[in-house]
Amino acid sequence: MFFTDQNEPSEKTGYLNEAFRLFHLRDQASREFSWHYHDFHKVVIFLSGKATYHIEGRSYPLKPWDILLVDRHAIHRPEIDSSVPYERFILWIQNDLPYQELLSCFQKARDRSYNLIRLSSGLQEKLKEILFQLEDSARTQAFGQDILTQALFQEFMVYLNRIFLEKQYIYDKKSYSYDSQIASLLQYINHNLQADLSVEKLASRYYVSKYH
């Protein structure tokens, strides 16, 4: 199954058995998301609503058709204003793809500490076209569905990597804010997953309220 219109699971890591899975979601539920991470990579394509995505100490207020690259194990959470409908595509991607170069953009996002792709209208239309074709193919049961869906997924990821690796996106320092204390805390958690990570211990180490 490549496609689902059911809600994206909110467990700490989630589960993905196939190479990738595409979600197209629209809801207006009042939900609080805790900090979490996944064992797979994630692409978020924001379509409409009011949302801010927090990833490893950086906060990105989103505009329609903004794209976020969330590397596996990156600690993140969305902050959603439920006063308006929230619509997005979510793409989950396994780490053991046959073509590993398609995952280069996630490592580069981590290296740059920058996860946002904001596109010019021309590049935006190109990715929209591929994405909608991918959605249509993933939904159908027609002849060759698996082959075409895989090909469209690879095409989408090739263009996404070209855009991000070659910095063809629109960069604006005002497109995000940075919390150095939260970033330091999350980095500590990432590197000490076997240590005592209780709320009390972390609050004491970083001098923050455990209710923060």
Q: What does each model-identified segment do?
A:
Residues 73-98:
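Ligand-binding loop in jelly-roll beta-barrel domains
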